[in-house]
Swiss-Prot record:
GO biological process, one term: translation
GO CC annotations on file: cytosolic large ribosomal subunit
Protein name: Large ribosomal subunit protein uL22
Keyword Zinc appears in the UniProt entry: no
Classification via SUPFAM superfamilies: Ribosomal protein L22
GO MF annotations in UniProt: rRNA binding; structural constituent of ribosome
Keyword Secreted listed: no
Subunit structure: Part of the 50S ribosomal subunit.
Described purpose of this protein according to its UniProt entry: This protein binds specifically to 23S rRNA; its binding is stimulated by other ribosomal proteins, e.g. L4, L17, and L20. It is important during the early stages of 50S assembly. It makes multiple contacts with different domains of the 23S rRNA in the assembled 50S subunit and ribosome.
NCBIfam families: rplV_bact (TIGR01044)
Biological classification of the source: Bacteria, Bacillati, Bacillota, Bacilli, Lactobacillales
Keywords on record: Ribonucleoprotein, Ribosomal protein, RNA-binding, rRNA-binding
Entry-linked InterPro entries: Ribosomal_uL22, Ribosomal_uL22_bac/chlpt-type, Ribosomal_uL22_bac/org-type, Ribosomal_uL22_CS, Ribosomal_uL22_sf
Length: 114
């Protein structure tokens, strides 16, 4: 049977826009995990903190579940899909209202051995 060389972690229905999450994920894709964590620590963005948690979870999954070495891991996949949108309304002039879409993301990070 083939040996497992990757581990995955997901955060579902996170209250951050997928578009903004993708900007951060593009910075870490393909990097080794130590560099990716350093990049996320110094990224001044709400999504960066959430993505850092997901990345640390993926690293822990790799170490504990599959016995992989942290030093050999790279971020092989990192993507954000759209979650459910919470729809709200802001009151406007003359009794009208404007819609507000509070978007959510499903963030997935996969780490693999190089």
């Amino acid at each position: 049977m083939a040996e497992i060389t990757s581990a995955k972690a997901m955060a579902r229905t996170v209250r951050v826009s997928p578009r903004k999450s993708r900007l951060v994920l593009d910075n870490i894709r393909g990097k080794n995990v130590a560099d990716a964590i350093a990049i996320l620590k110094f990224t001044p963005n709400k999504a960066a903190g959430i993505i850092e948690k997901v990345l640390n979870s993926a690293i822990a999954n790799a170490e504990n579940n599959f016995g992989l070495e942290k030093a050999n891991l790279v971020v092989s996949e990192a993507f954000a899909n759209e979650g459910p949108t919470m729809k709200r309304f802001r009151p406007r002039a003359k009794g009208s209202a404007s819609p507000i879409n509070k978007r959510t993301s499903h963030i997935t990070v996969v780490v693999a051995e190089k």
